[in-house]
Amino acid sequence: MQAPPTREGPRINDMIDEPTVLLIDAEGEKRGVIPTDEAIRMAEEAGLDLVEVSPNAKPPVCKLLDYGKFKYQAQKKANEARKKQKTVEVKEIKMRPNIDTHDYEVKMRAMLRFFEEGDKVKVTLRFRGREMAHQELGMVLLNKVKEEVEPIAKVELYPRLEGRQMIMVLAPK
């Protein structure tokens, strides 16, 4: 013997097993506490469904509405909410300590675009060979980046050395 499948969502029409319900009609007016079978009859006469909107209340609150339309609206609302959610990505900008001015400007434009999109930016400064002896140049460059983006971004992870590279993470304000 298998249990009947459980339905998602509110109980409707004959699934409501309470003797009385607090009825709200299609216009949103309170009709008061009435027997469930009378509420179902009223719903059928109006060509609507009796939908339980607040099952935990005593007596449960039920509303007269078109269940198909109600379900569609709820689905639409959920989809809109899902679209508005944006996962914050961490974009990476790679530089060298002796970066040329034009290259630096191009990297900064890309960084500003990432901030406008709401993404975090990881600035990676890579040292090669003897450049490791001049880490202060890297710190100067990262401080310059930090000062330029100060109005629109905040430092989430201050510059630190990891192996042969210096890393700083910035997040939009």
From Swiss-Prot:
GO terms, molecular function: ribosome binding; translation initiation factor activity
Cytoplasm is among the record's keywords: yes
Pfam families associated with the record: IF3_C, IF3_N
PROSITE patterns listed in its UniProt record: IF3
Keyword Cytoplasm: yes
InterPro entries from the UniProt entry: T_IF-3_C_sf, T_IF-3_N_sf, Translation_initiation_fac3_CS, Translation_initiation_fac_3, Translation_initiation_fac_3_C, Translation_initiation_fac_3_N
Biological processes annotated in GO: ribosome disassembly
Annotated GO CC locations: cytosol; membrane
Alphabetical keyword list: Cytoplasm, Initiation factor, Protein biosynthesis
Subcellular location: Cytoplasm
Family: Belongs to the IF-3 family.
Cited function: IF-3 binds to the 30S ribosomal subunit and shifts the equilibrium between 70S ribosomes and their 50S and 30S subunits in favor of the free subunits, thus enhancing the availability of 30S subunits on which protein synthesis initiation begins.
Subunit comment: Monomer.
Official protein name in the record: Translation initiation factor IF-3
Organism name: Parvibaculum lavamentivorans (strain DS-1 / DSM 13023 / NCIMB 13966)
Highest classification ranks of the organism: Bacteria, Pseudomonadati, Pseudomonadota, Alphaproteobacteria, Hyphomicrobiales
Encoding gene per record: infC
